[in-house]
Amino acid sequence: MKIDVTTLEAKKAGSVDLTDGVFALEPRGDILHRMVAWQLAKRQAGTHKTKGRSEIALTGKKFVKQKGSGGARHGDRKAPQFRGGGKAFGPVVRSHAFDMPKKVRALALKLALSAKAKSDNLVILDEAKLAEPRTKAAKDAFEKLGLKSVLIIDGAELDANFALAARNLPNVDVLPVQGINVYDILRREKLVLTKAAVESLEARFK
């Protein structure tokens, strides 16, 4: 699969051959859904908590005698049916993460890359570098390329000027290749890969 390479000035800079096994797979919405659910569950804080009846700071004394009152039988005021009592089956601090096989995770990433390539939302950039960290320079470059909602993946090391310039722009994310993930790919309309990122990804999936 051959695709044109462009520069930040929107000029053609040759072409690159993409591996079909990484960028030309048939779409699988079920795998992508599983992967996004896994990512979102994994990043949940899980710090929500309510107090059960054993944690409420009240006396445990039985407040009404067992028989003869004419009312229902009760133990102490910490029971869930009373105001100020403990919560029955409330949330506890826990991890929401669940297991996902490595092969499924790898497949999901390849499917996300393939989905962008198939929908013509994949752009290959010669390099993501700027002479100085100016947001206007990055904004002008993205406008020339027609990029409004975009995830930009560079090589293992980001260009500091480019990363700083793009940081203030809305709907623009810049990540090193080791940070690439399915959720961020799908949440942006366009995916931009530098040539260095393409080489790293293809080496990773060999």
UniProtKB/Swiss-Prot annotation:
InterPro entries: Ribosomal_uL4, Ribosomal_uL4-like, Ribosomal_uL4_dom_sf. One of its GO terms (molecular function) is structural constituent of ribosome. One of its GO terms (biological process) is translation. SUPFAM superfamilies: Ribosomal protein L4. The keyword Cell cycle does not apply. Residues 65-85 are annotated as: Disordered. Keywords: Ribonucleoprotein, Ribosomal protein, RNA-binding, rRNA-binding. GO terms for cellular component: ribonucleoprotein complex; ribosome. The keyword Hydrolase does not apply. Coiled coil: none annotated. NCBIfam families: rplD_bact. Belongs to the universal ribosomal protein uL4 family. One of the primary rRNA binding proteins, this protein initially binds near the 5'-end of the 23S rRNA. It is important during the early stages of 50S assembly. It makes multiple contacts with different domains of the 23S rRNA in the assembled 50S subunit and ribosome. Forms part of the polypeptide exit tunnel. Part of the 50S ribosomal subunit. This is Large ribosomal subunit protein uL4. The lineage of its organism: Bacteria, Pseudomonadati, Pseudomonadota, Alphaproteobacteria, Hyphomicrobiales.
